[in-house]
A protein has these predicted regions:
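Conserved residues at the C-terminal ends of beta-strands
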Residues: 117
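Metal-dependent nucleic-acid phosphoesterase active-site entry motif
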Residues: 1-20
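PIN-domain endoribonuclease scaffold, especially VapC-family toxins
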Residues: 3-5, 24-94, 104, 108-112
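Detector for Asparagine
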Residues: 19, 111-114
Length: 118
């Protein structure tokens, strides 16, 4: 069975930043997974901001997108009502927009591997 893999900001940061404490672990795990990795624009935006101090980090992020290693597979316009409901439902947690989009993506891709932590 083929699985789509949904990634969050932490995975992208660890993949790109060689100084990240999880870099080796993430790169080893991703060798086992066929691209593309799925994500959303909110994750790309968070990653862009957090990569500002990583030498060539933003360039690496754009290259991953250009090479289709990572693809944006979420349409906020189409899912806005559901996202608003998720943000309301989890307001006590709280969740970010990126978190809500990833939750929705896991619902849209039931065969996804979306919990990827050590």
């Amino acid at each position: 069975m083929h699985y789509e893999v949904i990634v969050d900001t932490g995975i992208l940061l660890a993949l790109i930043d060689r100084n990240d404490s999880h870099h080796t672990w993430v790169t080893e795990r991703l060798k086992e997974i066929a691209p593309p990795l799925l994500t959303c624009e909110a994750v790309i935006s968070e990653s862009w901001f957090l990569l500002q101090r990583v030498k060539r980090g933003r360039e690496a992020l754009l290259q991953l997108l250009a090479q289709k290693q990572i693809i944006i597979q979420f349409d906020l316009d189409a899912e806005l009502v559901t996202i608003m409901a998720l943000l309301s439902r989890y307001q006590s947690v709280p969740v970010s927009l990126a978190d809500a989009e990833l939750i929705r993506m896991s619902e849209l891709y039931p065969n996804s591997l979306n919990v990827y932590s050590r």
